[in-house]
């Protein structure tokens, strides 16, 4: 597993990315989510998803009150599928930020935000 921290100064938002996650990382994922305020069924579901170890899975949890997100991207069968999962999960982050800051999801700001998040992960993706 690789971990990465992205800080979006314009929004005061921190995104913790956990990439190439496998079943042995389930406890660490659970701890990160719990620290963010995730609990109950969503936490149990996330833990189970990681523990299953199936390829091409991901999840995103955001605490909009604290301006923090955790993005978990499991192992993928190929780089193209990994990119798909990364973009999918980062779009959830954009949705959460957009909800708080009233960013138009049909406008350029949301598109640039998504592009910036994905670009920030380039070195991890390049692996």
Question: Can you say where each PLM-predicted feature lies in the sequence?
Answer:
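N-terminal low-structure segments adjacent to metalloprotease catalytic domains
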Residues: 1-31, 56, 60-62, 99-100
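Generic structural signal of hydrophobic/aromatic residues within well-ordered alpha-helices
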Residues: 29-33, 46, 121
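Acidic-and-aromatic substrate-binding clefts and catalytic sites of carbohydrate-active enzymes
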Residues: 76, 80, 102, 111
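Short, solvent-exposed secondary-structure capping/transition elements
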Residues: 82-83, 96-103, 123-125
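Short alpha-helical catalytic segment bearing the HExxH-like zincin motif
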Residues: 81-89
């Amino acid at each position: 597993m690789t971990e990465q921290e992205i800080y979006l100064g314009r929004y005061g938002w921190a995104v913790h990315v956990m990439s190439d996650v496998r079943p042995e990382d389930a406890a660490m994922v659970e701890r990160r989510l719990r620290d963010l305020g995730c609990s109950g069924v969503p936490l149990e579901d996330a833990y189970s998803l990681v523990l299953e170890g199936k390829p091409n899975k991901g999840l995103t949890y955001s605490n909009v009150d604290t301006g923090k997100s955790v993005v978990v991207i499991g192992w993928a069968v190929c780089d193209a599928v990994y990119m798909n999962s990364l973009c999918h999960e980062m779009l959830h982050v954009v949705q959460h930020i957009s909800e708080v800051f009233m960013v138009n999801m049909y406008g350029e700001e949301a598109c640039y935000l998504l592009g910036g998040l994905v670009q920030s992960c380039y070195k991890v993706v390049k692996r």
